[in-house]
C-alpha cells in the first residue's frame, strides 16, 4: 500500500501519518512543495521514532510519481466523489492520494485520475471534511483488513 500526500501543509498531520504507515506496512510518498521541512521538530515529535520503520519518499510532482510507478492503480480521495471507499476492491500495491489540508486535491489534479477511482469517505451532511490523518487512517485500515495478516492474539 502506498499513501501519497499531495503538497501536505501541516507537519503534525504528516508525522501522525508516518506512524500510521509504519504500523500498517505502507510506504509514504510526499509530493512537493511541502509546507514544512522534513527535519522540523513538529514532524519528528508527531512521528516519534516511527520514521525509521517506514519508507518516506519525496517526489517533485505528481506526474513524476505516476511515471515512476505506472503499474500502481492510483485512487484519489475527494469530498466531491460519489463512490464510497468501501465499494472498491483494494489492492495491496495500490496508491491512495490525499490532498492538502486546506483545500483537498485540486480539480485539475483530480481530473487526471479516472472518475471511477475517486473515493468518498462518508460523513455527516453539512460537514466539510475530516482531518487528513484521520482520512488516511480510514483508508489504510480498510486496505489492511483486506491484505494484512492480523495477529492471532491481541498485543497486550
Predicted regions: what they are:
Residues 40-107:
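S-adenosyl-L-methionine/SAH cofactor-binding core of RNA-modifying enzymes
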Residues 105-118:
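Acidic-glycine-rich active-site phosphate/pyrophosphate-binding loop
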Residues 26-27, 73:
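Residues at the starts of beta-strands that form the adenosine-phosphate
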Amino acid at each position: 500500500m502506498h499513501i501519497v500526500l499531495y503538497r501536505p501543509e501541516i507537519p503534525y498531520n504528516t508525522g501522525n501519518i508516518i506512524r500510521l504507515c509504519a504500523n500498517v506496512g505502507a510506504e509514504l510518498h510526499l509530493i512537493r512543495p511541502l509546507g514544512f521541512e522534513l527535519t522540523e521538530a513538529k514532524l519528528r515529535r508527531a512521528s516519534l521514532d516511527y520514521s525509521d520503520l517506514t519508507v518516506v519518499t519525496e517526489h517533485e510532482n505528481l506526474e513524476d510519481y505516476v511515471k515512476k510507478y505506472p503499474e500502481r492503480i492510483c485512487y484519489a480521495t475527494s469530498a466531491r466523489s460519489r463512490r464510497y471507499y468501501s465499494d472498491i476492491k483494494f489492492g495491496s500495491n495500490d496508491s491512495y492520494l490525499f490532498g492538502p489540508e486546506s483545500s483537498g486535491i485540486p480539480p485539475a489534479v483530480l481530473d487526471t485520475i479516472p472518475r471511477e477511482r475517486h473515493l468518498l469517505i462518508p460523513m455527516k451532511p453539512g460537514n466539510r471534511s475530516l482531518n487528513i490523518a484521520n482520512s488516511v487512517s480510514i483508508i489504510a485500515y480498510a486496505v489492511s483488513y483486506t491484505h494484512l495478516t492480523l495477529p492471532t492474539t491481541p498485543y497486550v
